[in-house]
């Protein structure tokens, strides 16, 4: 049953990602940043649909298997959409600015946070980790207590990894860099807060990169297509919003999955 549900989720993720991407296409392909998109309303519909499908995948697979697998399935759906969408060059020639890209990245990171929060609330905590009931989503603002935020600080590792690895406009390189960075962040978060459920950590890598993008966007000016052609754009500004959301969800899920028996025990006094 568990493996069957994972297989179905993968198929749904691929089909949904491809179908939604086709709605956001213009003559150059799938537009990566919707607020400046030349595709109009259909682009907004495509983004809304892919996030809705990702949410249902997270809840469904999370309930049948576990929360981490559910969020990984959601990330896969977003990842298929991201792979079909354009690069920073396409965004620039579609009149997107560095600031608008950063703002959309932050919005998508917050959506990933809502998706994570709701999945933990519906499907429950990760089964292989100790649980502090006060930190779970159903206990008011428990997911945002200091231990959660300390674990989320590990997302700094994602920023460093992306700055080192995202050197070209390749979609595979962009998503791969975010995924690997998020994986490292998850492993670090678990090592320093082994008793903290990663409700916030799943979205933290995307949010961290989005905030760095916002800071870097201020000196870049409104249009930056010339900088892209010259290769003068910072690696982090090459990442598109959906790349961040997909890589963050998938990478954190993989990182926690790879460290099931890792992490030092913490004191209960926190």
Feature map (PLM): residue ranges:
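N-terminal signal-anchor module of multipass membrane proteins
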Residues: 1-54, 250, 269
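Membrane-helix interface "capping/anchor" motifs
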Residues: 2, 55-73, 170, 188-203
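Membrane-helix interface motif
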Residues: 20-31, 80-92, 172, 214-226
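Hydrophobic cores of alpha-helical transmembrane segments in multi-pass inner/ER membrane proteins
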Residues: 46-57, 104-126, 182-183, 243-259
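Hydrophobic alpha-helical segments embedded in the membrane of multi-pass proteins
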Residues: 52, 176-187, 203-206
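Membrane-interface helix-loop-helix junctions at boundaries between adjacent transmembrane segments
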Residues: 55-141
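C-terminal transmembrane helix-loop-helix hairpin of multi-pass membrane proteins
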Residues: 96-104, 188-270
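Membrane-water interface at loop-to-transmembrane-helix junctions
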Residues: 135-161
């Amino acid at each position: 049953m568990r493996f069957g549900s994972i297989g179905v989720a993968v198929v749904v993720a691929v089909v949904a990602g491809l179908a939604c991407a086709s709605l956001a296409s213009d003559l150059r392909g799938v537009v990566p940043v919707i607020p400046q998109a030349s595709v109009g309303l259909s682009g907004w519909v495509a983004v809304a649909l892919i996030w809705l499908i990702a949410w249902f995948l997270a809840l469904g697979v999370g309930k049948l298997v576990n929360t981490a697998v559910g969020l990984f399935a959601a990330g896969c759906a977003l990842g298929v959409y991201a792979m079909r969408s354009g690069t920073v060059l396409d965004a620039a020639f579609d009149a997107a600015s560095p600031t608008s890209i950063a703002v959309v990245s932050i919005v998508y990171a917050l959506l990933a946070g809502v998706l994570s929060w709701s999945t933990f609330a519906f499907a429950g905590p990760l089964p292989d980790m100790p649980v502090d009931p006060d930190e779970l989503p159903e206990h008011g603002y428990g997911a945002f207590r200091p231990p959660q935020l300390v674990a989320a600080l590990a997302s700094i590792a994602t920023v460093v990894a992306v700055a080192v690895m995202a050197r070209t406009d390749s979609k595979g390189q962009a998503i791969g860099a975010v995924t690997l960075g998020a994986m490292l962040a998850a492993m670090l978060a678990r090592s320093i807060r082994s008793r903290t459920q990663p409700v916030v950590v799943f979205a933290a890598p995307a949010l961290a990169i989005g905030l760095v993008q916002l800071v870097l966007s201020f000196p870049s000016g409104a249009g930056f297509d010339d900088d892209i052609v010259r290769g003068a754009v910072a690696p982090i500004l090459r990442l598109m919003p959906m790349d961040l959301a997909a890589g963050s969800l998938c990478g954190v899920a993989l990182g926690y999955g790879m460290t099931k028996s890792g992490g030092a025990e913490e004191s209960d006094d926190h």
